[in-house]
Amino acid sequence: MEFCVLFGGASFEHEISIVSAIALKEVLKDRIKHFIFLDENHHFYLIEASNMHSKYFAQIKEKKLPPLILAHNGLLKNSFLGTKIIELPLVINLVHGGDGEDGKLASLLEFYRIAFIGPRIEASVLSYNKYLTKLYAKDLGVKTLDYVLLNEKNRANALDLIKFNFPFIVKPSNAGSSLGVNVVKEEKELVYALDSAFEYSKEVLIEPFIQGVKEYNLAGCKIKTDFCFSYIEEPNKQEFLDFKQKYLDFSRNKAPKANLSNALEEQLKENFKKLYNDLFSGAIIRCDFFVIENEVYLNEINPIPGSLAHYLFDDFKTTLENLAQSLPKTPKIQVKNSYLLQIQKNK
């Protein structure tokens, strides 16, 4: 089976998406037929596999690449001989952050009837916004940490609104990869933390910070009626897993497997199933959980995890191919014009 990797995008996580695509190339190798790069101006470009390395993208603004146009079933490429269509195999949406995870690309791919692996529109909207994720989890009976939601209008009253003690963690509501996230240990650190978070999002979440809390990450997908899980990761971290630890540490190829009881493993998987539901059909997602006093709490849903969390799966290629055979289908609307014909007939 062949794939096409779509990466880049106009978001703060643009470079992270490039790193993910390069990593996935090493895993899937010749199964990837095309690499499609989406730049910050929303232009699509075809990238040769031999150019999928960091040095090339560090200088990509100096390259003169012919832009492509997204169309039904593929991409259009203009040439001296006319317009040529590049037919796309199954697309892997690997655009992190805005564009890829907020629903824009999902709607575009669905509109042009291009088959893809990744979250659909509703799943993207709910998981990209951390506040909406909390509401979604609560409705499903999945616990989350207490929180305060701030915007520019009420940020001046932050200390009055926060009902829990220092330290607490400040994070943008609409951003991933630990961008704009800071731990606040005393009042004088709050202004900087808020300024940093509001750079990435119009809304900011504040949660209690629990030193040394147990954190477990679980990736997976639903293939027909059965769930396929990765092994459960227990991240090695300092206070929290920051941007550098996630994306600039190339010393690890495999994540540390968690040592936990069968009962706790089952709890994590049951919570994952509730969250995945049918909403995330067609996607490999990663749920990050906290365990506090033997209770499982959702930290966040990552709808497009870095490199699709391939490092957590014992057989990632098989998982991906099986998921490709179990994608949600959009019903085709049959337009018959029966009402218009009846109106015309009655004239």
From Swiss-Prot:
GO terms for molecular function: ATP binding; D-alanine-D-alanine ligase activity; metal ion binding. It catalyses: 2 D-alanine + ATP = D-alanyl-D-alanine + ADP + phosphate + H(+). GO terms for cellular component: cytoplasm. The gene is ddl. Mg(2+) 1 binds at residues 288, 300. Belongs to the D-alanine--D-alanine ligase family. Residues 134-332 form the ATP-grasp domain. Pathway: Cell wall biogenesis; peptidoglycan biosynthesis. Mg(2+) 2 binds at residues 300, 302. PANTHER family: D-ALANINE--D-ALANINE LIGASE, D-ALANINE--D-ALANINE LIGASE B. HAMAP family: Dala_Dala_lig (MF_00047). ATP binds at residues 161-216. Keywords: ATP-binding, Cell shape, Cell wall biogenesis/degradation, Cytoplasm, Ligase, Magnesium, Manganese, Metal-binding, Nucleotide-binding, Peptidoglycan synthesis. One of its GO terms (biological process) is cell wall organization. Its cofactor is Mg(2+); Mn(2+). Pfam families: Dala_Dala_lig_C (PF07478), Dala_Dala_lig_N (PF01820). It is an enzyme of class 6 (ligase). Cell wall formation. This is D-alanine--D-alanine ligase.
